[in-house]
């Protein structure tokens, strides 16, 4: 055995160096930490320690560490692996024969002492049970005797009292004799009762003793079984295990575990011995799962030896589920709804002839076929089911009542629409409009002698096509205003088309009839060409001659409107939840989103929950066209409502609903659908669009951030600006909205290099700071003409100039000379204009261009000159061209740039 140092020996036997040095010193062997220790010194130290502490039995300690992997089922059908490490430690003791005999003798003495103690305990218990039974029997007999004596005394007293009252003094002797006889009889009965009680007590005592003996015998048998198993356990522990390899040690440990736990009444299943890991898996996954199940199974209960019992019974038939399928669904979502793996769904689709991936979106019909093929019940769900349910859950009265007509005034710009309505309302509205033209839809209701009429005043400018179309859709009657001195104009024709598209009757108001050059007959002729036939010509359109300035014919116009409404028999339900249409909307800085709503049916009350396109909210306030607060609005009444979550789009349907939560869900659903449709329309990634972009070349863009006061103006301006786009310059609206110009708008304009345009709105303080810091182009407008003209000018500045060739001189070749430096030199006479050097030229022969190049040399009498005027001779050298002949014409021109503009 090789020598080791004290330090190494301390590490080997797992003790401190200082303690080992001290033990060597106590044994008479002085050592330091770095000194070496021989085998003789080790034996001497061991002998010293045995003398000091006594020699213990030989022991063998085995430490075992096993690792395993456990798969745990997680959420979503996924499983994760958990590493488990089990550490065990067993100590085996080898004792000498003398020690074993001594321990066996001690154990035998211990068992005998326990047996003696058990017998003494049984005898003591038996004696105690007998004494207890005797005491209970005596107490019971005593109590019964006392109770009997009391009863006898009471009976005696009663009888004596009765006898005293009935018998006379002569019968006293007989009574005393009867009493003595009765007393003797009672004493005999008492003795008989006492004897019976003693017999009962003795019987119970014997029964208790027999029961105690039986219990003691049973306990003795159980203890004997335990003692025998305990002795076997100890005898096994004292056996000698000669372990030579780690495999044998593990086998011995497992055998010992089974014997020990079998003696305790708990039979653990046999553990599957794990082999060391190698590159090839030595056992299958099923074997590993079975082994782990055997190790884990039944922690809390008693189990039989090594039986592997499956705890879950597979159902006899598949579970059929109700699968709810929307309009579109992914394969993974369908598998999740059916509680199956995605691979099974893909297999089922492949059997049906459809290839799909797990994240592929499939339509409703395909999903229905797959689900039914796999045995499930399918419930088809429409995406707008919630929207339809909310819309249908409304209280409406059944009684329809006559309502006021909704009249839209349409016509060409500056034909007097607003002035006509202004006279009817006896107000001055036109002066408030910028430039004297209407740029919003104005909604008013007026009370006449014959009833109420609601008027919608639409713009006549060409930019407000969408706004006029909305007015025609929401109306009952269209009043077409045509100036008598101007006749039918483009917007007049457009108004006729809108009225025909909406199938709305038309009443023609021939305005400005008081002007000297008014010609109503010309108006009738022009309108008849577009399908508007007067009644006097056999048509169905009423013509009324009016003057908005003088008030002529206004009453006749109102009568014609009311007559037309009576023919239409306009009715609406007045009671119940209201519905209507958004005429106009805008963002007020102090009040938030404001929407002008025309109620079609029902009654709109303050506090109602309304659903309006993508927006929803509770009506916080309602105002009429005179800016007066109102609490309710019936059919055909226009009102401004406050309280929506955002600015709705003009033309959106307004519906009163019951539940604000459902209204929010429907609004969010509509926003999502709109976003999907918007994304679907973006075709930049499509092949045909890619080729179109390749062929376009470089296209300049004018970026604009547009803010206006109302939604209709935003639509009109955006549409007009986008129509200005050409193949070379395009208008791009990078941002638009309703309300003032904010810091966000300014930041967007700075990032996209855009022009900030405000139509009837202004920038706030924070936006102005950003505009000044970034030097942005901010422009305010109140008339749409000026806005469109300036954007046109900006676009024209981005157009590349047009190149034009202008002829500046013409020379005739009279002779041809040869020059060693320039080749053929043409001797020419300037017949027109001026010949300039280094200008492009054309050589013409018989008025046909045969060459186009550059004038390289220009001389007059051997002197180089820059230009030669008309009527002078000169020599011309054409660059890279020598085929000049007499009689040719040399044409000199220059290229000039002409700035283009957008019409």
UniProtKB/Swiss-Prot annotation:
Residues 68-82 have a biased composition (Polar residues). Residues 547-549 are annotated as: G5. Residues 49-314 are annotated as: Disordered. Residues 93-163, 174-225, 280-293 have a biased composition (Basic and acidic residues). Residues 265-279 have a biased composition (Basic residues). HAMAP family: IF_2_B (MF_00100_B). Keywords: Cytoplasm, GTP-binding, Initiation factor, Nucleotide-binding, Protein biosynthesis. Residues 411-418 are annotated as: G1. GO terms for cellular component: cytosol. GTP binds at residues 411-418, 457-461, 511-514. One of the essential components for the initiation of protein synthesis. Protects formylmethionyl-tRNA from spontaneous hydrolysis and promotes its binding to the 30S ribosomal subunits. Also involved in the hydrolysis of GTP during the formation of the 70S ribosomal complex. Residues 436-440 are annotated as: G2. It is found in: Cytoplasm. The keyword Amino-acid biosynthesis does not apply. Residues 457-460 are annotated as: G3. This is Translation initiation factor IF-2. Residues 511-514 are annotated as: G4. InterPro entries: DNA-bd_dom_put_sf (IPR009061), EF-G-like_DII (IPR053905), EFTu-like_2 (IPR004161), IF2_assoc_dom_bac (IPR013575), IF2_II (IPR044145), IF2_N (IPR006847), P-loop_NTPase (IPR027417), Small_GTP-bd (IPR005225). One of its GO terms (molecular function) is translation initiation factor activity. Residues 402-571 form the tr-type G domain. Belongs to the TRAFAC class translation factor GTPase superfamily. Classic translation factor GTPase family. IF-2 subfamily.
